[in-house]
Amino acid sequence: MVKLSIRAAALAALVALIGSAQAHIRINPTESPAGGREMYRMRVPNEKQVNSSRIVGEFPAGLKVYAFEPKAGWTVDIRRNDKGDIVGATWNGVLKPYEFLEFGMLAINPEAAGEITWKFVQYYDDGTKEEFVGAAGSRLPAPVVTLKAVTR
């Protein structure tokens, strides 16, 4: 009986861990060629019991985002720096509880191999927010993409 309880507790912990790991904003693909063009997809889940209505993104330095995939019912407000480069965006719409959406972006990667970090804040209709800006392994990690060197 004790063995069964330990197994049940271990299984419950594993399910909770997997569930929480999937609740994060993600960027796909997680690997891309340095200097290459890429279609990035931001996957946004809503595991709260209230609507999520805004996602604010800050793009990695050196990444040149140049187009956004339209999403029915959502608007995209683009933020630019002094040079006119797109440095972030705000998506506004309705993401109902326990649903997810994917938002596409076209970009040119920085030339240098290494990691680039995206930062997102997800806002909810009850006034709360989740900031996906933490280090890997934190409760709310920022999505990271590894840029691989290309041999030419």
Regions inferred by a protein language model and the residue ranges of each:
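Extracytoplasmic/periplasmic copper-protein system
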Residues: 34, 123-152
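Low-complexity, serine/threonine/proline/glycine-rich extracellular segments that form mucin-like
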Residues: 30-68
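A surface/secretory-pathway sequence property marking extracellular, secreted
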Residues: 60-87, 143-149
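Sec/Tat signal peptide C-region and signal peptidase I cleavage site
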Residues: 18-23
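Bacterial N-terminal signal peptides that target proteins for export
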Residues: 1-10
